Swiss-Prot record:
Protein name in the entry: Aminopeptidase N
Residues bound to Zn(2+): H387, H391, E410
Annotated stretches, region: Metalloprotease: 67-967
Entry cofactors: Zn(2+)
Cofactor: binding comment: Binds 1 zinc ion per subunit.
Lineage, uppermost ranks: Eukaryota, Metazoa, Chordata, Craniata, Vertebrata
Length: 967
């Protein structure tokens, strides 16, 4: 699944400051072009009830662990072999106003250990009685006696259908369970659900799926665990005018449905052996564009007919073939299927989902329009496609054994998405962006005492809610970061060879992370060049089995190098033990005054010494070249001063990525009280002559924390003046490069730098920027059919107009939002609507999030996050969340990956005793309701608030003085 959109999957690929000066208030709205990894698993809840009163009952039990149906993991007694599933979705409501689907399922399974209980997952399905029971059971091959059912029951808490038998099943024999059922085709974005959209003023309804991680059971009864692989024969009964899609191609043309000639039946080819969470089927009237890869694989891009007719699927079609071919070569394994369908859905909770052969996307992650999509939108499309196609091998062909190793699936895809996208767009330098989008992004979370290791014991991940929590930035971005580090010190060639060996060995099977280490070790052992200080397993286990990461400290006077577990709050208490005592085996690259040095390994000890890190009076050293290692670097004060001098005299001597590193690391070290905050601020002085994107983005991301802490205090005035001074040369640079904004930069990085220049200049009151934005918006408002604003600058211009305007400007943008046909444009407009500095307008906007006809369910949490990023809106959203917590939790709390992002967003300004007390009271008040997938985020918010409170008390005066002196 794609990184959340992360909206998260903020989280993001491109963070753009959208804040703009208003008459009394400067509002900066962060808009994140990101691959949000929203999730859609749900946990069930049930009260205890009495024992069953009849042969077939629906019962919710207490968790008496001696009963196998009260254990969340399936017993190993039965293993599925195949499913024959027929489903019929009704896309008009019944006489009760409900949308439903009906279905039948025949699951064949093998008995591995004799048992008199059949346990299979089932969620919110109503069964048609078979001789008084919910299912029928028979032996395969006609052996006797046939199984006799005593009773069947549904266990709501563990989401099981339980079949109690008179006699045990026989080990080694196959059985078939037959069921007929009905479920609701709800609009909850989970399992088999419905999506709605408007086409030419007419409401259209489609049926689609999202199974990961525990929602296949909501569509039909199944053994819903990733290691319970089987083959699937899917048949869909659907209206004549609609098309049905699934993981495989149809066996042949659709045939009339005998009971009703207005319906037809589409039967699909048998799937390879696969996991339930990768199943997909869709019924819609969508159109497509198609091509064939050189290998012969059929490639189709599906979307609303109007989107296809306008060419919005063409870019995805263009890059899919090259990316598939790249991964076939990269993995040394052919694409396993004969077709690759990708479909853009109007309602989709995740950024995308890697269903085998039928990948589902948010529209913003698949559709691109040259006229109205920004460079960030285009980058998102190619990287999300690469992420999902990477999964077709790593995740689908070879699958994790259990969700505790989710990082192996998602971390790998989050790393190689940059490789696949770079192959499709080789001039964009996309691989460099991983440092900003993943490494630095996840360090902010991994530096908390409440973080968690990449891999945890399987016994700690059981319930659907626990599984949902694993879908976080640690699994995605830290997983990607440490795999990138591993690939770097092994070399990419050895890494690829190990991956290919791993895939060849375990194809159609399941693995744990140790299997990957074994195959990488095998390729290391077969060559003489790369020498490691220990085995791959010994090195990497320290990075995945203990949380956090080290800060490497260098004393250039003595050449001493040391490591320490880095914590943003040095007073926080780490309660999670580590078998490695929070020491890592660290690969260290370095340069001396611009010249590369030999590679060095810091073994799993606290301190070592090497002359590589010892300097003379005129030398400086810089560690972690291009940030290939997952760690921070600190230096003695003298070396820091030399680096600062180098940056202010000739910054080109230090690579671009490391110019970003110097800024990022220093601000984090200052937060942890390892360097003075003035040192970190001094590292931004060179920006007055910097035009590259990455250093500026690192600075803006770091200084955004200062803004959050101080935009309600007297510090903000001098801070605004300083940033205005620093960004003005960058704004003037792009004014010249673009010939007074009549042209646009050629390279992607320069385009991103231009976006930062304009958004930051407008945010901090550069008059020329404000005039530019106002002029462009006025031209558009005068002629709405002809938008003169370049897509790259629209978010900034829209936000500026809303912040400086009133109800008229807000209503105009709202009208354009309602009319927007391309979701990328709608997202820009929706984000800008949060920029208002008028409380009543923001409260009205908040109320719209409760109406799915105004704000789609998939967009609610991101809309709330956008409003909370506005200094005026933050308190409003916090009050809104507290007042509406039960409804928000009911709608999004049990599965949505973005739900945890909402908690993070609404609390990120918290830095006072009162706000800490409010947060603690909020936790206390809602213990009965619960926090679902935001449980860990709430604990992290409490930890961050305490750290913020302490940091502001200690640094406010010195920061005020520094900005005053340097502005």
């Amino acid at each position: 699944m794609a990184k959340g959109f992360y909206i998260s999957k903020p989280v993001g690929i491109l963070a753009i400051l959208l804040g703009v000066a208003a008459v009394c208030t400067i509002i900066a709205l962060s808009v994140v072009y990101s691959q949000e990894k929203n999730r859609s698993t749900e946990s069930s809840t049930a009260a205890s009830t009495a024992a069953p009163t009849g042969p077939t009952t629906t019962v919710a039990t207490t968790l008496d662990q001696s009963k196998p149906w009260n254990v969340y993991r399936l017993p190993k007694t039965l293993i599925p072999d195949s499913y024959n599933v027929t489903l019929r979705p009704y896309l008009t409501p019944n006489n009760k106003g409900l949308y439903v689907f009906t279905g039948t399922n025949i699951v064949r399974f093998t008995c591995k250990e004799s048992t008199n209980i059949v346990i299979i997952h089932s969620k919110r399905l109503n069964y048609t009685s078979h001789q008084g029971h919910m299912v029928a059971l028979s032996g395969v091959g006609g052996f006797h006696p046939q199984p006799v059912i005593v009773r069947t029951e549904l266990v709501e808490l563990t989401e099981y259908l339980v079949v109690h038998l008179q006699e045990p099943l026989v080990a080694g024999r196959q059985y078939e369970m037959n069921s007929e059922f009905q479920g609701e085709l709800a609009d909850d974005l989970a399992g088999f659900y419905r999506s709605e959209y408007m086409e030419n003023g007419v409401k259209k309804v489609l049926a689609t799926t999202h199974m990961q991680a525990t929602e296949a059971r909501k569509s039909f009864p199944c053994f819903d665990e990733p290691a319970m692989k089987a083959t699937f024969n899917i048949t869909i009964i659907h209206p004549n005018n609609l098309v049905a899609l699934s993981n495989m191609l149809p066996r042949g043309p659709s045939v009339p449905f005998g009971e009703d000639p207005t319906w037809k039946v589409t039967e699909f080819e048998t799937t390879p052996i696969m996991s339930t969470y990768l199943l997909a089927y869709i019924v819609s009237e969508f159109s497509y564009v198609e091509t064939r890869a050189p290998s012969g694989v059929l490639i189709r891009i599906w979307a609303r007919p109007s989107a296809i007719n306008q060419g919005h699927g063409d870019y995805a079609l263009k890059v899919t073939g090259p990316i598939l071919d790249f991964f076939s070569q990269h993995y040394d394994t052919p694409y396993p299927l004969n077709k690759s369908d990708q479909i853009a859905l109007p309602d989709f909770n995740a950024g995308a989902m890697e269903n085998w052969g039928l990948v589902t996307y948010r529209e913003s992650a698949l559709l691109y329009d040259r006229q109205s999509s920004s460079s960030g939108n285009q980058e998102r499309v190619v990287t999300v496609i690469a992420h999902e196609l990477a999964h077709q091998w790593f995740g689908n062909l070879v699958t994790l054994e259990w969700w505790n190793d989710l990082w192996l699936n998602e971390g790998f895809a989050s790393y190689v998405e940059y490789l696949g996208a770079d192959f499709a767009e080789p001039t964009w330098n996309l691989k460099d962006l991983m440092v900003l989008n993943d490494v630095y992004r996840v360090m902010a979370v991994d530096a908390l005492a409440s973080s968690h290791p990449l891999s945890t014991p399987a016994s700690e991940i059981n319930t659907p809610a626990q599984i949902s929590e694993v879908f976080d930035s640690i699994s995605y971005s830290k997983g990607a970061s440490v795999l990138r580090m591993l690939s770097n010190f092994l070399t990419e060639d050895l890494f690829k060879m190990g991956i290919a060996s791993y895939l060849h060995t375990y194809k159609y099977g399941n693995t744990i992370y140790l299997n990957l280490w074994e195959h990488l070790q095998q390729v290391v052992d077969k060559q003489p060049t790369i020498k490691l200080p220990d085995t791959v397993s010994a090195i990497m286990d320290r990075w995945i089995l203990q949380m956090g990461f080290p800060v490497i400290t260098v004393d250039t006077q003595t050449g001493t190098i040391s490591q320490q577990h880095f914590l943003l709050d040095p007073q926080s208490v780490v309660t999670r033990p580590s078998q490695f005592n929070y020491l890592w085996i660290v690969p260290i690259s370095s340069v001396r005054s611009g010249s590369p040095q030999a590679h060095y390994w810091l073994p799993g000890v606290e301190k070592a010494q090497n002359d590589l890190f010892k300097t003379t009076a005129n030398d400086w050293v810089l560690l972690n070249l291009n940030v290939t290692g997952y760690y921070l670097v600190n230096y003695d004060n003298e070396n820091w001063k030399k680096i600062q001098t180098q940056l202010q005299t000739d910054l080109s001597v230090i690579p671009v990525i490391n110019r970003a590193q110097v800024i990022h690391d220093a601000f984090n070290l200052a937060s942890a009280q390892k360097v003075p905050v003035t040192l970190a601020l001094n590292n931004t002085l060179f920006l007055i002559q910097e035009t590259e994107y990455m250093p500026w983005q690192a600075a803006l991301s770091s200084l955004s924390y200062f803004k959050l802490m101080f935009d309600r205090s007297e510090v903000y005035g001098p801070m605004k003046r300083y940033l205005k001074k620093q960004v003005t040369p960058l704004f003037n640079h792009f004014e010249r490069v673009t010939k007074n904004w009549t042209d646009h930069p050629q390279t992607l990085m320069d385009q991103y730098s231009e976006i930062n220049a304009v958004s930051t200049a407008c945010s901090y009151g550069v008059p020329e920027c404000e005039k530019l934005a106002a002029t462009l918006f006025a031209q558009w408002k005068k002629n709405p059919q002809n938008n003169p604003i370049h897509p790259n600058l629209r978010s900034t211009v829209y936000c500026n107009a809303i912040a400086q305007g009133g109800e008229e400007e807000w209503n105009f943008v709202w009208e354009q939002f309602l009319k927007a046909e391309l979701v990328n444009e709608a997202d820009k407009l929706r984000g800008a609507l949060a920029c208002s500095n008028q409380v009543w307008i923001l409260n009205r906007f908040l109320s719209y999030t409760l109406d799915p006809n105004l704000i789609r369910k998939q967009d609610v949490t991101s809309t709330l996050s956008s409003i909370s990023s506005n200094v005026v809106g933050q308190t409003l959203v916090w009050d809104f969340v507290q007042s509406n917590w039960k409804k928000l939790f009911q709608d999004y709390g049990t599965g949505s990956f973005s739900f945890s992002n909402l908690i993070q967003a609404v609390t990120r300004r918290f830095s006072t005793e009162f706000e800490l007390q409010q947060l603690e009271q909020f936790k206390k008040n809602n213990m009965d309701t619960g926090f679902g997938s935001a449980t860990r985020a709430l604990e992290q918010a409490l930890e961050k608030t305490k750290a913020n409170l302490k940091w502001v008390k200690e640094n406010k005066d010195v920061v005020l003085r520094w900005f005053t002196e340097n502005s």
